[in-house]
């Protein structure tokens, strides 16, 4: 393998190892949680990872890109743009199920019961974090759509706004009086 190809597999391999470690720890019984703990932890990890890479990729594009006279990204910045474009879909795909999983986890009911008995709206209304996941999913969708529609350098600056909002929405939700 050439060094760039090996480097391209480093990040997904690291993610896979971390996901397996988190799953093994939570499934070991050392963590006193519910059955929803593993999917919620993996959803948090996947969405956080994808969101951080999207935000970092946008910053990388804005700092290092050398656009041509028409404002089109150079080849190296375009590679970063492709990473942002693809991981925004992963971010969105992780955030959407997290809305239901977080609402169910906060209500301490299984997701299937909450969805089948019509408690989804009440679950979202009672869970601040589930509403934050709606914000994350919306931000990820905006980035996924907009990054797909343009390869001009100027459009990457406004994309920082939903990226920052999406990355910080879940961590800043709640208050100091709430538990971990």
Can you describe what each PLM-predicted range is?
Residues 1-180:
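Polytopic transmembrane helical bundles with strong interfacial aromatic enrichment
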């Amino acid at each position: 393998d050439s060094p760039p190809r090996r480097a391209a597999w480093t990040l997904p391999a690291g993610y896979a190892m971390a996901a397996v470690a988190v799953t093994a720890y939570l499934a070991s019984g050392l963590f006193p949680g519910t059955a929803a703990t593993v999917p919620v932890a993996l959803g948090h990890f996947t969405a956080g990872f994808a969101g951080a890479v999207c935000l970092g990729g946008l910053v990388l594009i804005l700092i290092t890109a050398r656009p041509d006279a028409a404002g089109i990204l150079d080849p190296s910045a375009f590679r970063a743009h492709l990473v942002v474009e693809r991981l925004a879909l992963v971010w969105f795909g992780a955030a959407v199920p997290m809305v239901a999983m977080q609402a169910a986890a906060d209500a301490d009911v299984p997701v299937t019961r909450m969805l089948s008995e019509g408690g989804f709206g009440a679950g979202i209304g009672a869970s601040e974090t589930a509403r934050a996941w709606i914000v994350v999913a919306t931000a990820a969708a905006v980035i996924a759509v907009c990054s797909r529609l343009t390869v001009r350098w100027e459009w990457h600056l406004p994309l920082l706004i939903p990226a920052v909002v999406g990355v910080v929405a879940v961590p800043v939700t709640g208050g100091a009086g709430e538990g971990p």
